C-alpha cells in the first residue's frame, strides 16, 4: 500500500527562524494520526501575496501567518471570520474551493490557556496592557467570557480609546498608565512587547495583591520581567505566553483538520526544551 502524500502547511514570517510552529503542529499530527507536512518559510516583506499564491499553486492546504504579515493576510482573504475582522489581522489561512479563508486564533489561544490555568474570567475585572495588534486580537474572545469589565491601558490613552470605540462594548474603557493608581483588577494581561526588550510597562505596584493573576503574552527560558515584577509584589499567580502559543496553534489545527489536539503534552515538551 503506497503512503499518501502529506497535506502541505506553512508558517510565513520575517524573521521566521525562531518559530516553534512546525514542531507544535507535527506533534499534534503525530498524536492525532494526521498526515501533514508543516514547514516554516521566510518571506520577503514585499512578497507575501506572491508567496501565498505560489504555495496554493503547489497544492498548499493552509498556512499560519506571523509578523509582519498578519494585516496583509487579512487583505488577501476572500472570506473572514468575525474574530479576524474585529482583530484586524489574520494568523490562519485555509485554502479551499479556490478561495482563501482568513481566521485569527490568537484570542482563543489566550482564553483556553487562562481556562486551563483555572483563571476565572466570568465577572472578573480585567486590565489589558497595550492597545496594539496583540491587544486587539484577543478582545473578542475575552469579551465572550463575560468579564465584568476590561480596562485597556496604554502609554497613549487615545490609542486605547480608539480600540474601545472599535469594539463598542459597554464593558470596555480606556486609560493611560498613570491613571491606574486607585483601581482594582482580578486579572492583568500584558499585551505589550515590553518583556521582549527586558522592560516593564510603567504601571503602579498598587495594582498587585494576593488576589491578582498576571499573564504575559511573551514567554522565554526565564521568567519575563513583567511576571518577575508581579511575583515580587505579591501577585497570586503568574503565567507566561507559552500556553497561548500552543493554544492558538491548536485552534488553527482544528480549523484545518477537524480534530482537537491535546495541548498540555506539547506545552510540557516545549517548556522542557527551553530549559
From Swiss-Prot:
Sites binding NADP(+) sit at 82, 130-134, 154-159, 217, 241
- What EC designation does it have? 1.1.1.25
The residues responsible for catalysis, as annotated, are 70 (proton acceptor)
What biological-process GO terms show up in the record? amino acid biosynthetic process; aromatic amino acid family biosynthetic process; chorismate biosynthetic process; shikimate metabolic process
**What cellular-component terms does GO give this entry?**
cytosol
Q: Which GO terms describe its molecular function?
A: NADP binding; shikimate 3-dehydrogenase (NADP+) activity
The reactions it catalyses are: shikimate + NADP(+) = 3-dehydroshikimate + NADPH + H(+)
Positions that bind shikimate: 19-21, 66, 91, 106, 219
Which pathway does UniProt place it in? Answer: Metabolic intermediate biosynthesis; chorismate biosynthesis; chorismate from D-erythrose 4-phosphate and phosphoenolpyruvate: step 4/7
Keywords on record: Amino-acid biosynthesis, Aromatic amino acid biosynthesis, NADP, Oxidoreductase
Q: Which domain of life is it from?
A: Bacteria
Name the SUPFAM superfamilies for this protein. Answer: Aminoacid dehydrogenase-like, N-terminal domain, NAD(P)-binding Rossmann-fold domains
Pfam families, A to Z: SDH_C, Shikimate_DH, Shikimate_dh_N
Q: Which InterPro entries match?
A: Aminoacid_DH-like_N_sf (IPR046346), NAD(P)-bd_dom_sf (IPR036291), SDH_C (IPR041121), Shikimate_DH (IPR011342), Shikimate_DH-bd_N (IPR013708), Shikimate_DH_fam (IPR022893), Shikm_DH/Glu-tRNA_Rdtase (IPR006151)
Q: What's its job? A: Involved in the biosynthesis of the chorismate, which leads to the biosynthesis of aromatic amino acids. Catalyzes the reversible NADPH linked reduction of 3-dehydroshikimate (DHSA) to yield shikimate (SA).
> Which family does the similarity line name?
Belongs to the shikimate dehydrogenase family.
Subunit field text: Homodimer.
* Record protein name field: Shikimate dehydrogenase (NADP(+))
Query: What gene name is listed for this protein?
Result: aroE
